[in-house]
A protein has these predicted regions:
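S-adenosyl-L-methionine
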Residues: 1-87, 91-92, 96, 140-143, ...
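Short internal loop-to-helix segment that lines adenine-nucleotide cofactor pockets
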Residues: 28-48, 110-112, 120-172, 183-188, ...
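Active-site flanking residues adjacent to catalytic metal/cofactor-binding acidic residues
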Residues: 50-52, 74, 102, 150-152, ...
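Short, glycine/acidic-enriched loop or turn micro-motifs at the edges of active sites
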Residues: 54-56, 78, 104-106, 154-156, ...
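General small-molecule cofactor/ligand-binding pocket signal
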Residues: 98-100, 201
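Conserved SAM/SAH-binding loop
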Residues: 102-106, 135-136
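Binuclear metal-ion centers of metallo-dependent hydrolases, dominated by the metallo-beta-lactamase
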Residues: 122-123, 186-217
């Protein structure tokens, strides 16, 4: 039996594959985390967007359809990346999306992905040799344009990802949208980003995602 295909705004087509989670919104004809995406669409256009923890492509597809000239879709889980690439193909967005099958960390290396729940995105990065680990700074080599937005939802490794982003933050000053689940993570992100001239501005969603913007030259 073939997978169900659903249309989303922007001419995007997606296939529905269990488990549903964010795809419940797709079945209603809308994107997951729509308020966050609407804010990004209103305030940030052009350049390269980096979708760290792209999962099955919800944010990548929106960015490619509405906001960015290029999207780097960074996702370490093979099954998720395959679903993402199918959605990109169906939507005709191959020329705008650059897939990167890797986890994000403070340093390049190797690791493994441990499935820690039932949903597509519930994988944790652990020691191993099954998947590449890259840094946000290393991704600069793939960027065709200055980086406008970085979104990070990488299951407890957001702080490590920020530690590997010094050159990117200094060069392009992108807006950052980071999922930070604990007060400790929030404080750690503030400590990294404040010396780089960033201010935490807005909070979105029940799994809190925070916007950070560069506040000085």
């Amino acid at each position: 039996m073939s997978a169900q295909t659903v249309s989303l705004p922007g001419g995007v087509l997606v296939t529905i594959q269990p488990p549903l989670h964010q795809q419940k919104q797709w079945l209603k004809g809308r994107y997951y985390e729509a308020p966050l995406l609407a804010h990004i669409r209103k305030h940030y256009r052009g350049g390269t967007f980096i979708d760290g923890g792209a999962c099955i492509g919800n944010h990548t597809l929106f960015f490619a359809a509405f906001c960015a000239q290029q999207v780097l879709a960074v996702e370490p889980v093979e099954r998720n990346m395959a679903h993402l690439l199918e959605n990109v193909r169906l939507s005709g967005l191959q020329d705008k999306v650059t897939p990167v099958r890797a986890a994000l960390g403070a340093l390049p290396g190797r690791g493994a992905m441990l499935h820690a729940g039932r949903m597509h995105g519930e994988y944790n990065l652990v020691a191993g040799d099954a998947v590449d680990v890259t840094t946000l700074d290393a991704l600069l080599a793939l960027c065709l344009y200055p980086v406008t937005v970085v979104k990070l939802d990488v299951q407890w490794t957001e702080i490590a990802a920020l530690q590997g982003a010094a050159a990117l933050l200094k060069r392009d000053h992108p807006a950052l949208f980071i999922e930070l689940m604990t007060l400790g993570e929030l404080a750690a992100a503030d400590d990294i980003l404040r010396p780089c001239g960033y201010t935490r501005t807005l909070k979105f969603g029940g799994s809190p995602t925070y916007e950070y913007v560069r506040s000085n030259g």
